[in-house]
Amino acid sequence: MGEYKKYWIAVVAVLIIGFSILGYLGTDVYHQAPPVPTAYVSQDGQVLFTKEDILHGQSAWQSTGGQSVGTVLGHGAYQAPDWTADWLHKEVSVMLDIKSQEAFGALYDQLGPVQQAAVKEVVKKEYLGSAVREDGTVVLSPERITAMNLTGRYFVELYGDNPDLTLTRDHFAMKDNTLPELQDRIDMARFFFWTTWMASTQRPGTDATYTNNWPHEPLLDHNPTPESIAWSVVSVIILLCGIGVVVWLWAFGKKDDEHALVLPIEDPISKITLTPSQRALGKYLFTILALFLFQLGMGGIIAHYTVEGQAFYGIPLAQYFPYSIARTWHIQASLFWIAMAFLSAGLFLAPIINGGKDPKYQKLGVDILFWALVVLVVGSFAGTYLGVAHQIPAAWNFLLGHQGYEYIELGRIWQWIEYIGILFWLVLMIRSIIGAFKQKGDKNLIAAFIFSVIMVGIFYGPGLFYGEHSHLAIMEYWRWWVIHLWVEGFFEVFSTTLMAFIFVTLGLVSYRAGTVAAISSGAIYLIGGIPGTFHHLYFTGVTSTIVATGASFSALEVVPLVLLGYEAFENYTRLHSAPWMHRLKWPVYCFIAVSFWNLVGAGVFGFLINMPVSLFYIQGLNTTAVHAHTALFGVYGFLSLGFVFLIARYIRPEVEFNDKLMKFGFWALNIGLALMVLISLLPIGLIQSWASITHGLWFARSEEFMQQPLLQNLRWARLIGDTILIIGAVAFFWQIVKVLFAKKS
């Protein structure tokens, strides 16, 4: 370890502490998850429905696309309502009217303030006190049963083909007969009711509901808990302290060894003879850009569905290709092409680390992995389509069709195939890199890279730790291990280490600086990133301890982003540090874009939805979409594109990039993304946020609110940014086609 010992100690300490917290509080998620009652019963003991009905309803909901049609507990798609908040408001409204008529002979809205307060207090008491008895059942009053049945009827008809709700389905981008079987719809409604029950029932021993008073519902006086407010303030203080510490350490820890670098006259990587496995990566690059274009095409379709919910410019597309499938393919395609770019970058760099040599059968392994990825993409897309079309038997939907959970929509069997493919990539990487340890010299940078490769290789696995009928709180815990920890955590560490290796190999960064950056990034990104996973779980049925942990540690994730301006400047400086660097101009420009969007998308827009008191009001609004697009595409998308063009530069060195085409594509992608956010998603999100704060989450997601002319116009305005973005992607795709298929000189 030598001079790097303190950095390795920091990484090990962060991993031990971080995973201890994540694991220990994970047991709290399991033990404190809101119960699923054995049955809901009437006061005279009649069974209304059972736990088995709820679990069957969960499966039925998954078969519709689940979180791809509206949201449950705030997680999912943003066009239709949040079914938890929507059901709760509808049911409580009916309940208030019933109680008002019983007490005063008039509807709730017709009462005076004093009478309304009295009725509301009675209803609040009943909802909060709807506890599970010792026998595992929950008793519902006759009034609540009536309110539940009236509300349930609406959802049964909405997911069917009742002509009275055709316009509503159009506004929600739902096809007719989203769930064809009546019994499935009835049980799905029971599943929705259960989510509202836990969102309105008091957690034993606390003054809040199981979901920490979420969603904001004025009819029940659902407001942020004192803990949510307090820990939001603490998170801001932690953020400011963290920024101060990082800037201090950065300023005093800077070394001047970079100024002593003697830059090479020629590109060192260009002098390394390409191995067969590296030359085999061309098909990866083509597929990555093709999937990128496909993803944007799906994005254009779902954006149009927000203004014309059952058609595409008059073509009745939804019955055959509904919003839920377009959104599923949009998300899955993005994950596939970004992951494939990262895998390609690793496979390209591994032989360089190994002194320009391939281990035996490495090219065969690279080819096998590619075709396995093709089978995975085609097969999982077909599975999700057939699942939502209900062409797969219900018992097989979770395995082969649509899991119903955002970002992990593909069926469980396809998920296993994906994980096996990632593990196969891990084997290819390790067997290629391991020989480098026989070389002379320091091995710390190699060790850091292997560490990041192993983390990427194994941490997709937790997505397999929940099942079809797992509790939503438990499912969300493991789902965010993949989305947050695997992608936002270990992908970040992998990319930083890979970039360090590339710049060290190019002679633009000293070995010491590259090694320190690679190792320390693990500690810096993961110190907040591992326990910070909990900030996605505030309102999914967890305790206030998890809220406090998520708020505190996730604030630290923003801290290193304050130095991204300097990182962008360093990358720009490297571009002009040697004459031969102009050939790497566009990959470096992509890396500069990563720094910008990391600060804006992950930093500014990420922290906007990070604090508990903020997320309490804006969970599931378009503010989340702002963060998702600017962070996922702005950061990981541009990083992936940078990797693609870097690899293309070296595997086809005789072909020059078309500078005008690349310039157009680069700026079109950046400007298109910025316009999509600034003139559409962000204004919609902010308007929704105000509506949620003043009227409740149900209203901010309601048909009445979302169909206002202003919001319709803002959704149409997205067409401007989307069009520019797609044109930029076409330019990049065409450049890769020209490079890969140009005649070899």
Regions found by a protein language model. Name each.
Residues 31-229:
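Soluble extramembrane regions of membrane proteins in the secretory/endomembrane system
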Residues 40-45, 311-325, 617-620:
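Perimembrane loop-to-helix junctions flanking transmembrane segments
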Residues 66-72, 77-111, 116, 357-429:
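Hydrophobic or amphipathic alpha-helical targeting/insertion segments
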Residues 256-281, 357-360, 574-584:
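Membrane-interfacial, low-structure loops and terminal tails that flank and connect transmembrane helices
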Residues 404-412, 441, 474-484, 541-553, ...:
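Non-cytosolic membrane-interface motifs at loop->transmembrane helix junctions
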Residues 92, 258-271, 444-447, 697-698:
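Juxtamembrane inter-helical linkers in multi-pass membrane proteins
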Residues 1-50:
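Post-cleavage N-terminal segment of exported redox proteins
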Residues 8-28, 57, 61, 211, ...:
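Hydrophobic cores of alpha-helical transmembrane segments in multi-pass integral membrane proteins
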